[in-house]
Amino acid sequence: MAALALLGFALSACGGGDTSDVPAAEEPAAEEPAAEAPTGDPIKLMTVTTLNANGPTYENIAITANLAAEYINDQGGINGRPVEVIVCDEQFDPAIAATCARDAVAEGVVSVVGSFTYFAESIVPVIAESDITWFGACCPISPSELTSPHSFNIGNQPMYAVGEVKRAVEDGCEAINAVIVEGADAIFRGPMENAMTAYGKEFGDVIITPTIAQDYSAEVARATTGADCMVVVMSETPFLTWNTALQQSGSDIKQYGNQGNLNAISAKGAEQVTDGNIISGMYPDISTEPWDEYRMMLEKNNVDQVANDFNSLGGMGTWAAYMGFYQIASGIEGDLTAASFFEAASNTSSLDLGGMVPVLDFTTEWTDGLPGYARLFNRSVVYSQLSNGQVIPVTNDFFDVSDLAMGIAPE
């Protein structure tokens, strides 16, 4: 079986809470009573992602899924029952992704939560037959994720790429080139070009880069020709190679990139050329208030936040997904099953995650928007930037880019 079940997961045997000393002259502060430990049959959830593959992997998703389960169980579980997470590694193989789907059905999971895979088309139709939802995805890229009634996306992909165009134009960029990693152009290029049209512009060039490359010098040379800015959609690993080539090129072109990929890891060694780069994303920076509990869990478990980026689509997206599931599931009276959760999610008109994303309405599809994107409920972006190789927030305000994605000029 490609899935690994983890219950009550802790990343470090020596992880702990606050150990600061209390002055002897003071009475210790009264602690809030601990929540009663959950009991009974576990509520099984699955998270699907890539952990072992020759290409991008997403350990931050698996780690966060288990941290979220631990957090929920620390609060007493869901209506008194513990949460059990099954992490399924699809190994960047559609056949194994299909096995994950069958395992979800066989294990009786209530929902597949906070997942990212390039092969959701091998999963969503299979689990939907058993009323199992595909809940809270950050980054939908397959038709089923964007159209199936059993898909409840919390992230906004591909809208952050539209946000890159918006910010580049508003920053005064005159000549803009686009760089999109191979395989992503099918869902990103159209909305990005629509946004350019809305501003009365068009890309000077659109460069499609290979997913895996040892050197992007040729592509960088093309992207920096005849442009003062470029908007880039790329995963973290190729972005590292890209930024290295950009630094070596000596170009001073301004770059706009996507959250969780244009980051401290991919900017390492290229701090000079990436300084001031703008990051368009789905979620406010991890340093902000909506993520207080997430940061607490990372610190409590002594998670290595250098090896993996948790200020990212995978990290924050998975946490938001689990908190969304927690909120909806906690309000269900009676048995919590795949079918009852599907019904509850379908009737949720105001999912408020405290600023992680805008308040979401799962009862209203985007039927008057881009064809094929009906289940994209979040269409707003938020911005950060790179400063000396570190990501810092620009604003916590969300900007709706629905109209730009359809080529409608801003008023």
Where are these regions (language model features)?
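Extracytoplasmic "Venus flytrap"
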Residues: 35-66, 90-94, 116-117, 181-187, ...
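Segments of small-molecule ligand-sensing domains
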Residues: 303-312, 327-393
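Periplasmic-binding protein-like
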Residues: 47, 104-117, 135-137, 177-180, ...
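Low-complexity, Pro/Thr/Ser/Glu-rich flexible segments characteristic
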Residues: 18-40
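C-terminal motif of bacterial Sec signal peptides marking the signal peptidase cleavage site
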Residues: 10-13
